[in-house]
Amino acid sequence: QFDWKEKLKFSFKNGEEFIFNVGSLILSASRFKYWAICPSTSQAYLFDFLTNAFEALGGVPKEIVIDNASTMMDKARTERSDGKVNPKFQQFADDFGFNIVPCIRARPNTKVKVENPMRVIDEIMTYNGLLNNEEELFEKMQEITNEANSRVCQEIGIPPILVFKKEKEHLLPLPNDKICSYYKNTTIHAKVNSCLLYTSDAADE
């Protein structure tokens, strides 16, 4: 499941303010979390985030539950309508091979896997005013992500990283490098360093 935590406002020790968004992709079986800081929730950053997430995970989930954001859905899914997927997002899904599962508007329980764990990201706000710069902020976010994947998850009774090692075997293979490079949007990377990506080092073991 995918979601954004949007427009977090953070202050450094010198008073400088930094506004950022956090992308979250959480695997269903293991509850393994992939979080990244992004300056924008635009479609370009969406594709960039998901592509880097898939590469870090070593594969692609068979389906992804999404909300009705305009970067993904042209028309929201409701009780009476399937909605309409944004054509560029549909092409992205086709290129990576996953199925899109839109949430039904006004039924928030369909996103609980993402939104409950996203509360953990609010831990970063406990460091508001205590850090010196963006680099320290990113390091703290990495610590929070790794801790979340390493501690026991109440829903499954064991740390997500342990279940992820098995779930990883069932991920779809990544497409070719040309497709991945296209969606990672090197122009964004060159200008803004794009999303800052974090996942547990243990995932590569």
Which sequence ranges carry the predicted segments?
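Mobile-element integrase/transposase regions
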Residues: 1-33, 42-48, 94, 180-181, ...
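Active-site beta-loop-alpha junctions of metal-dependent nucleic acid enzymes
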Residues: 35-60, 82
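Acidic/histidine-rich, metal-coordinating catalytic segments
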Residues: 60-81
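RNase H-like two-metal-ion nuclease catalytic core shared by retroviral integrases
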Residues: 66-67, 80, 100-122, 142
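RNase H-like polynucleotidyl transferase catalytic core
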Residues: 82, 88-90, 94-111, 130-131
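Polar, glycine-rich mid-to-C-terminal structural blocks
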Residues: 124-197
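Conserved small/polar residues in nucleotide/adenosyl-binding loops
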Residues: 198-205
